[in-house]
């Protein structure tokens, strides 16, 4: 499954919607996504499982890439 993770780049500042970024992670569950990203230096706001149609749409963006550690 592919998950879209919305995050802020810093742990020390209050989250601001305009600074929210996203990345895509392949994992078995939302819990696994959070475990994979727990040591990263950013604040996870939301993790969303995306549908096949949503994934196809996101892949049209030339900047689309799955996160790799």
UniProtKB/Swiss-Prot annotation:
Question: What are the record keywords, sorted?
Answer: DNA-directed RNA polymerase, Nucleotidyltransferase, Transcription, Transferase
GO terms, biological process = DNA-templated transcription
Give the Enzyme Commission number.
Answer: 2.7.7.6
- Pfam assignment, any one: RpoY
**Where does the record locate the signal sequence feature?**
none
**Alphabetical list of InterPro entries matching this protein:** RpoY
Top enzyme class: transferase
Q: Which GO terms describe its cellular component?
A: DNA-directed RNA polymerase complex
- What molecular function terms (GO) are annotated for this protein? DNA binding; DNA-directed RNA polymerase activity
Q: Which reaction does it catalyse?
A: RNA(n) + a ribonucleoside 5'-triphosphate = RNA(n+1) + diphosphate
Family membership: Belongs to the RNA polymerase subunit epsilon family.
Its quaternary structure? RNAP is composed of a core of 2 alpha, a beta and a beta' subunit. The core is associated with a delta subunit, and at least one of epsilon or omega. When a sigma factor is associated with the core the holoenzyme is formed, which can initiate transcription.
Biological function? A non-essential component of RNA polymerase (RNAP).
Q: What protein name does the entry list?
A: DNA-directed RNA polymerase subunit epsilon
Q: Which organism is it from?
A: Listeria monocytogenes serovar 1/2a (strain ATCC BAA-679 / EGD-e)
